[in-house]
């Protein structure tokens, strides 16, 4: 979940039978790429007063990743790692908005705002996302928020934004998130136009490692794109929006979610899909990193659809053979033919160009 609120109505739904108002909208609409980008505002304000808190338990402690022996890759310092794990070490307690000093807004969206915040008792710095229940109910996207909390709060990976905790009152829901000091990757891409091979390969290795971690836990993201990525203290990539994600034990879904430019053929054609949709998205993302725009970008939705299902892939002349090889192996019509995430991390172009800050932490089995 990025700092810009990115929950939008869709035909996506979970099969929950909850008796609350958390209902799914009945009208199905084609997913579109909607950018909600606003500049930071350097004011000091508090979003609320007189609030009632719900008991919320803090997540278990996270151990910082060990140093990597791979040349050119440096482990994150313990000072930064401790910043990211400090909340997990605090005693269990109740939270209210009065427990926080609220700083400048980090982002604004349709359903609320995100603020830089400091927990008063232990001086923890974080991003506090404040969402209005009335707006969530009005748009029928409460199920997405519930799903996002359920998924993101259990993920522990250096390239996935931490959700430490959450609490709520009568009108608002508050998400306690890891603060990503370097901000939004989308803005960085806009600023530079496109990234060089070293930065693109580094991001691809980090993304592949994080997605492999998710897939091992049967979590499909389904909406990887620059708008849903942030950058940490060392500029490392962090997946930050799980609004369209699903925890699917069967790893097979049929709803069409995500962003038009990034939708794979099987989702456009309404076929059953699995975790390999994220492989397609990774290929689109790599292309956009290097070129500055998605590979199937067209004036109309129908033309974009046509180009995607036909895999009408065109490379500009300045791309290297290695990068084109990686992208071509990810953007395959048949999901089973797409390069696995391990293959992305071991691809010669990635290994030759990546300057990753954090070592891989993917494990082949669940932690006990």
Curated annotation (Swiss-Prot):
Residues 100-350 form the Protein kinase domain. Component of the chromosomal passenger complex (CPC). Residues 10-23 have a biased composition (Low complexity). The active site is at residue 223. It comes from Xenopus laevis (African clawed frog). It comes from the Eukaryota. Pfam families: Pkinase. Keywords: ATP-binding, Cell cycle, Cell division, Centromere, Chromosome, Chromosome partition, Cytoplasm, Cytoskeleton, Kinase, Mitosis, Nucleotide-binding, Nucleus, Phosphoprotein, Serine/threonine-protein kinase, Transferase. This is Aurora kinase B-B. GO terms for cellular component: centrosome; chromatin; chromosome; chromosome passenger complex; chromosome, centromeric region; cytoplasm; kinetochore; midbody. The keyword Isomerase does not apply. It catalyses: L-seryl-[protein] + ATP = O-phospho-L-seryl-[protein] + ADP + H(+); L-threonyl-[protein] + ATP = O-phospho-L-threonyl-[protein] + ADP + H(+). The gene is aurkb-b. Residues 1-23 are annotated as: Disordered. ATP binds at residues 106-114, 129. GO terms for biological process: cellular response to UV; cleavage furrow formation; midbody abscission; mitotic cytokinesis checkpoint signaling; mitotic spindle midzone assembly; mitotic spindle organization; negative regulation of B cell apoptotic process; negative regulation of cytokinesis. Serine/threonine-protein kinase component of the chromosomal passenger complex (CPC), a complex that acts as a key regulator of mitosis. The CPC complex has essential functions at the centromere in ensuring correct chromosome alignment and segregation and is required for chromatin-induced microtubule stabilization and spindle assembly. Involved in the bipolar attachment of spindle microtubules to kinetochores and is a key regulator for the onset of cytokinesis during mitosis. Required for central/midzone spindle assembly and cleavage furrow formation. It is found in: Nucleus; Chromosome; Chromosome, Centromere; Cytoplasm, Cytoskeleton, Spindle. Its EC number is 2.7.11.1. Belongs to the protein kinase superfamily. Ser/Thr protein kinase family. Aurora subfamily. GO terms for molecular function: ATP binding; histone H3S10 kinase activity; protein serine kinase activity; protein serine/threonine kinase activity. The keyword ATP-binding applies. PANTHER family: SERINE/THREONINE-PROTEIN KINASE IAL-RELATED. Kinase activity is stimulated by cell-cycle specific phosphorylation.
